[in-house]
């Protein structure tokens, strides 16, 4: 018998091993996640956003997508980062109550806050210091990928970008914010308050002739110029007329001239997230529609924001086109953190009906650089004012320390010739007889304002106070839905007029204090069924006619999502419910990464959108209705469910006994 050479036997064995384990020969793919902050699905078209439109048409079009609620940036950033719902991550809103006087380690109390705005690197580092080095409690996908040998980077808008590698962010002994070698580039890069970049990144930026300091949003103009994208105007002065051009271009250049070339040269698989501030920032601040509902966020300035985000995506896609070997191995996933609506500060319905609450009837002394607003305007902090009046509670401003008296915070004057309102650009309030403790824990209610929704905390955990507050909320004409902590209302019928927080995924394993009550404000459409025409009551310093989000309304839960690349189907429309919570599980599946978990509020792998994946049959849309309060007032929640994951469409407060669905 002819003897088989040993070298040939080894060749056969290696071939058989490769067949038995395809993973041994498969090259790991790359993933680019592009987040267009505040992009509405209906804003994407071939003319204004050709790059976004191309991905939708050539790859997978997710036409039943969802943001998590509240529809806010850092909340959805936490879901995108971890694949967990907010009940697990604790990032309930952009502004929340941390339960402690939050300050930089070893800094005296006056430097802290109990109303932190999370789009801030220092605040995020403070939260990590207060909550075991990672306030999210869940591991971000990018951090896990980096540990497993992937190159990773997060680039873009301040706040949500750092959240993508949150467990790497901390204060060092010198009082600087470090990232343990992680690449995080945002608005604060290069500043003393920013996250330090690895030395190799700064060297590469110098070599690429790029500034080491991130540009501001001014576009090179003065603080009050309408060409400054950060200028929001006031009640009598229109806001910006331009997109965030200069800063966004710098982010795109850092990505395509430094980060992607670095990754390509190192020949390692990578995960890159780019978070475009536009169109969000431009829609917020646009000056096209001062004190008018039309054109609102559908005007020319908002369109410039759309075009700016699309320009950034095109620059990334052009780089891939110029590097075909990388492109062939790279998936691109597009999302937005939430939708958007035009702010209404007076009208509560499409027929022009205005709010009749006390807060809208008072005259106010403008704060800071504000100017007097039109009669009948709901001021910022209107919910705190109305609860204070109806509940016979004093209102205190947690952003201003008292200079006299026994209270730790300045009281907000309500009534008299001119009233005041709480907060400035950060809207928060403490309600009660007095508040002597700096952490606010002796207040009856703590309110954190977040645009289309507000969070209410009850430090005493008094169930009678919670029920009393729910009763007050049901009587306010601008309320669009009420949700109460399961500790007080575990079932849909336990708190008349309200549903439990677990119904919207806000009860989980979070380390942070959970709100006792979450309210969403009224939302209406000027054209029935047209999400682009949506108007939103908003607890905000911004004006009627500008833009905001945060509510549980379909114009804000319906974000924009699409994907293309070797792991995704081509030319496929996915009508199954899905959303931001599914991004991390899907990418982890594609890359072969095992994600650790603490909580169980997890998204699903989007198998139906992957190459070779079977189609899924979605369940019928579902409705949950609370027990009625007096006059039949009840909260209605409309949602979808698939593979045990809930996707929230809208909520409303119904008063007609015959109505069963939100208008």
Regions inferred by a protein language model and the residue ranges of each:
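Beta-strand elements within well-structured catalytic alpha/beta cores of enzymes
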Residues: 28-41, 54-56, 80, 145, ...
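Short, structured active-site-proximal loop/turn typified by the sulfatase FGly-forming signature C/S-X-P-X-R
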Residues: 42-95, 151-155
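Secreted, luminal/periplasmic, and some membrane-associated catalytic domains
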Residues: 70-72, 94-118, 123-128, 168, ...
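His/Asp/Glu-rich, glycine-adjacent segments
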Residues: 85, 91-289, 447-459, 465, ...
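Acidic, His- and aromatic-enriched active-site or binding-groove loops in soluble protein domains
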Residues: 86-89, 152-153, 169-221, 293-311, ...
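A long, amphipathic alpha-helix that forms part
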Residues: 241-274, 279-330, 357, 361, ...
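Polar, surface-exposed loop/tail segments
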Residues: 480-517, 575, 592-627
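Acidic, Ser/Thr-rich low-complexity intrinsically disordered segments
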Residues: 612-663
